[in-house]
Structures are given as structure tokens and as C-alpha cells.
Amino acid sequence: MAADPGVALPASSEASDNKAGSLLVFNYYNSDSSNAEMKNTTISVTNTHPTRSVIVHFFFVSSVCSVADYKTKLTQNQTYSVEVSDIDPDISGYILVVAENSDGLPISHNALIGDAYIRDDAKSVNLSAMAFSADWGVIGTPIPGALTTSSTVTANFSSAFGGYNKLPAAVALSSIPSRAAGDRTMLVLNSVGGDYLASAGDGTKAVFGLLYDDAEQAASFNLSFSCQYARVLDDTTPRTVPRFSTIIPAGRTGWMRLYGQDGTKGLLGAMFVWNIAPNGKRQGAHNLHHLTLTSVATSATLPVFPY
């Protein structure tokens, strides 16, 4: 089979939902086993490589940091889709997907893409997975220094040889609508470092934020979370002075900047927008904009076991 035309994206190109990678992050999923038709998430992962198969290791991380995982094999050009209600019902959180070999070691396989179709009573939206390239060796090469005799391996988001692309340090939500006409905005933040053998997250993350009106005036706020923060923005969340509805009144928009207070831990996330009014037409979702990258590597400890 002929290769795709054009020039391949370099492994050093930063994490994006518009490229393929060796590690994917789905920033949000949820489901309700008692009402799966109305509240559920369908995730899809595609192996875009034309000749090589790959093992994909899924880590489902709940908002309170508990981890459940499983693996499957994707042949060349294969797409795998699953309803979350069938495998991890009644949980919300994020999903980490890692390309591995049959021994359970992460490998360079910058050919994975993914999408999540998320629906509930208020909205039905598509959210692409964030892709992180492996920056080492040719395709199929295990992560440097990893041993099949080890029970764990460390994955570094370092943008250096032997690691994956860096995580964002500062992120932004753009075009936040006013609540006055029924528009609602949900902010999702994720911390993807930590130990995936027991409980993910790299400690409680203190986040500093700025909410701007459309005249460049800002109000600051603070929030904290461990693995995932998912809240609808209103006059109490986050707490600003003046309140959200004053900063973004009827007919106006604003935006938000967020970053970890220690300046080193990475953030990922997404924003969802919908309208609660009858026949409200506004709905959509996208991953947060990345403003800066971390100055130091964030690491994740992953279990090693064969497929």
C-alpha cells in the first residue's frame, strides 16, 4: 500500500488533537448504565499504520483517581469502537491509551488517532483525543531503558529522546458565552501524571485562573483537584469578584486562562458549551487551547504485563 502523500509530522511536533501519536488522552467520558441511550460515551481508536499492528492499553481514570485498565490489539488500518457503558459504566473521568508491544512495554507507534462521542440529556458532542508522539527510535521500538522483567515503566512527558511530547503548562478557554440566554459552559481539567498501578494523579493540583471580560478586565480565582475537575461555570464556580454573570453579562463573551500554581505540573482539559432553553441550538466541545508548555517533565508510572 502506498504511503500517504505529503511530509510526515515530526515526532517533536507538540501534542495535538490534529495528529497521530503513540499515546492518546481522551479528556472526558461518562455513562449511565440505567439510561445508556441518553447518557453514554462512544470511544474510537484507529491504527492508521498501513502495515503494522499494535497492542493498545486503555487506562480508565475516574475523577477520584481510581484506575481500571484493559488491552486489545489493532491490526493495520483497524478502528476499535466501544460504548463506555459496556466496559466502565457509571463512571466519569479521562482515558489514557498507550501503544505497546506484546510484552507490555510502551513502543514508538505514532499512528494512533481517537475520538469520543459524548452524549447526555443536554448535549451530544464529539471530542477528539489528544495525541502525544513518542520521541525515540523507529516504529515498534520499546521505550528506552524499559525491561520486560520490570513490573513498571516510567513514561515521561518531556519532549526529549525517550519521552513523549510535553504537557501544557497554561491552557485557555475561548469565547465563553453568558449564562443569561441559557448557555452553559463546563470546564474539564485533567492531571495525567502519577502512578497508574494504584491511583493516578500526581498530587493535589492547585490551579490559578483569570476570567476576562470582553474589555480586557480580569478577575482571578483559585481551584484545586487531584485527577479531574469537571464543573459548570456559574456565580459560585469558580468564585470570582465580581461574579461570573457580572463579568460576562447578557450578549457578551469572555475567556479564561489557567495554570498550575507551582508552574511545573501539566494540565490537559476541554470545554463543553450547550444551551438549556427549549430548542436551544448551541452545543459543542473542544480541547483546551495550549498557551505554554511545562518547563520540566511530568511522569506517569505504568504497569508492565504481557498481552
What are these regions (language model features)?
Residues 2-307:
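Gly/Pro-rich, tryptophan- and cysteine-flecked surface segments typical
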